[in-house]
Structures are given as structure tokens and as C-alpha cells.
Amino acid sequence: MDFSSLPYRPCAGIMLANRDGRVFVGQRLDAADSQYPDAWQMPQGGIDKGEDAEAAALRELREETGIVTDLVKIIGRSNEEYLYDLPDELLGKIWKGKYRGQRQNWFLMRFTGQDDNINIQTEHPEFKNWKWTDPQGLPDIIVPFKRDLYRAVLKEFLPLI
């Protein structure tokens, strides 16, 4: 199959910064079954049909971290949509084989709550662990195929953190 003709999945990503300028990352539950068992990522997820990117970002943040809307302030939105392609070994295996990668709208949000407001044991958990990390180290701890995208998001948001 020619995967290059597949569309990109619309997605919202969240760079969640705390008061100390550190960024939330989660370790996916399925990471142990992948070739990247130590990889982390920022919250992200698909934009539903008819949903705008900001609403999707807030929904995904709640679904993945338990953080409710009143505990975050949106500081910025990416000036462009960022794309990434899935590596060959994942093409046709995730998202029911309908997409070649993701087209992401990113949001920088300030977390105004306390760490105990974070609960990754949600109805449909995606993360097994979470931590606050130095934003400049993000590209080093994520899956290789998203590193360029994370570098671009960092370049845009780092001055605002």
C-alpha cells in the first residue's frame, strides 16, 4: 500500500508548564510493548469532527491527566500546524491504518493547580508515569520520529514559558 497518499490525523498537543517553568510529560502505558520503552510525551490527541483545536486540547488534557479547565491558563497557540510522519513499522498499524501521521495544533498552557490535582488514572488511561521536566531536554526523552516536531514547538514556546 502507498501510505504517502493517506491524510494526516488532526490533533491538538499541549505543552503544560508549571510555575517553575518545567513541562509535564507522561510515559505511555503501551511504551513497554514498543521499541521505545523509555519514551515520554506531552499530552496530545485527536480533534473530533466539528471540534475546534482549543476545545480538543482542553478535552485531551482532562482525559489524559485529570486536569480540569479552571486549573490551566492558555498562554499561546502555535503559529502553524506541525506535521510528523509515522515510522514505517507503525504505518497501517495504528489509527486503524487511516493516517500517515499527525497534523498538530499546539497550545502552551500554564498549570495553576497543585501536583495532587493531576491524576493519570483516568477513565481511559494513557500514561503509567508522569513528571515535570526541563523543557530543553524534551527532544532527548521522546520517540525519535517526533523530535523535530518537539524542537519546533520548543523554539516557538520556550520564550513564553
Name each region found by the language model:
Residues 103-113, 117-149:
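NUDIX/MutT-family hydrolases
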Residues 78-117, 131:
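Active-site-adjacent beta-strand/loop module that shapes the phosphate/pyrophosphate-binding cleft
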Residues 6-8, 36-39, 97-103, 124:
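A generic structural micro-feature
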